[in-house]
A protein has these predicted regions:
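N-terminal targeting signals for export/organelle localization
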Residues: 1-10
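A short beta-strand-turn-helix
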Residues: 11-28, 53
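Structural motif
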Residues: 28-29, 147
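Structural alpha/beta surface segment adjacent to cysteine/selenocysteine redox centers
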Residues: 31, 36, 42-124, 136-143, ...
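Internal catalytic domains of large membrane-associated glycosyltransferases
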Residues: 131-134, 145, 151-153
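Non-catalytic, surface beta->alpha helical segment in thiol-disulfide oxidoreductase systems
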Residues: 150-168
Length: 168
């Protein structure tokens, strides 16, 4: 953890944006700034499950760095994932949608839309959340994806997400 304390720290809180997986009382919070159309984010997604299942004291927060004026694919996938989090009892689980996108339909929007169908009102209702995340990323000067923070500190570039267990 000492190496993390020497890294850049997030200036503002992220508690009310994005999607969180894991217990709310977790000792460690891993914040991942991502984009559904980022290849490196796709690769990183494979490690998220391993991390969540390996320790009960970790929660993972996903924040999308996607402008609402972005490409159709980025926006539609972000809306669907956020829409599932907004109404989990009615629709699909957010982790199910993330898994399907990154593991089975990456960059294939038509396949994704055949599998996950949401009312237009649910999808459009996510635009404020998408804008809020995008503006937060800009205010923190986070322009690249993925970016990973552990308890608010930037994970050094020379480490991979799977190595987080050794850092905490």
């Amino acid at each position: 953890m000492k190496i993390l304390m020497q890294q850049r720290k997030i200036e503002s809180l992220t508690d009310n944006i994005g999607i969180v997986f894991g217990p709310s009382t977790a000792e460690y919070k891993i914040t991942i700034i991502t984009n559904p159309c980022c290849y490196w984010c796709k690769e990183l997604h494979k490690e998220i499950h391993n991390l969540l299942w390996s320790r009960s004291n970790i929660k993972i927060q996903i924040i999308f760095n996607v402008p609402s004026s972005s490409s159709n694919m980025e926006l539609e996938v972000s809306r669907a994932i956020l829409g599932s989090a907004a109404s989990p009892s009615t629709y699909y689980a957010s982790n199910e949608i993330l898994d399907f996108w990154f593991e089975k339909s990456y960059n294939n929007l038509s396949l994704f839309k055949k599998r996950f169908i949401f009312p237009k009102t649910i999808l459009e209702a996510q635009d404020n959340k998408i804008n809020e995340m995008y503006f937060w990323c800009n205010s923190e000067k986070l322009y690249t994806t993925p970016s990973i923070f552990i308890n608010g500190f930037l994970m050094p570039d020379e480490y991979e997400l799977k190595e987080v267990l050794y850092m905490i």
